[in-house]
């Protein structure tokens, strides 16, 4: 998207459209579940379908940029065929709490598998629940400032449904 930045030569020739309408269209574009933020019960909640190590690192960068010095509780559920040990251990490096869960799909890793894969520092609390609903309910009762639901699309979708959050916001 660098081509959409002001001052990039020949933007209008490359995209065959004036710069301002393209910029405005991009500003209105929504990516549900991609660093989607809202407030629920006085708690900042972030939904992000980070389901590979690169996406987890991007999520962590965004969290530290947008919420510096804030404690984070992660609700995580991953598919069994993903690199969840690397992702969980990256999260554990910054998390105050990690709540593991299993979305309702046969492809999902079991909470016990996730728990065995993570080696958190002493100050990071790790718990596990058999469902996303139970994990989210526990996370809302937790003390960290930020609740971040991440992992698979299934996990984020179930959490959004449990919390009554729409995947898109109205632009009107």
List the predicted regions and their residue ranges:
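Active-site-adjacent beta-strand anchor residues
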Residues: 49, 77, 129, 149-150
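A glycine-rich beta-strand to alpha-helix segment
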Residues: 134-164
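Glycine-rich phosphate-binding loops at beta-strand->alpha-helix junctions
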Residues: 80-82, 106-107, 155
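Flexible, gly/pro- and Lys/Arg-enriched active-site loops
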Residues: 8, 23-26, 30-33, 99-120, ...
């Amino acid at each position: 998207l660098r081509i959409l930045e002001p001052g990039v030569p020949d933007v209008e020739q490359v995209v065959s459209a004036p710069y301002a309408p393209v910029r405005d269209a991009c500003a209105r574009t929504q990516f549900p579940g991609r660093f989607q933020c809202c407030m629920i019960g006085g708690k900042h909640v972030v939904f992000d379908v980070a389901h590979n190590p690169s996406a987890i690192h991007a999520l962590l960068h965004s969290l530290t940029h947008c919420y510096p010095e804030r404690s984070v509780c992660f609700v995580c559920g991953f598919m069994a065929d993903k690199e969840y040990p690397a992702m969980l251990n990256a999260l554990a490096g910054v998390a105050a709490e990690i709540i593991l869960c299993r979305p309702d799909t046969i492809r999902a890793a079991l909470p016990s598998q996730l728990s065995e894969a993570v080696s958190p520092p002493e100050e990071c609390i790790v718990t596990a629940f058999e469902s996303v609903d139970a994990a989210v309910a526990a996370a809302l009762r937790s003390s960290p400032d930020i609740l971040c639901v991440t992992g698979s699309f299934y996990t984020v979708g179930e959490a959004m449904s449990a919390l009554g959050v729409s995947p898109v916001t109205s632009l009107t």
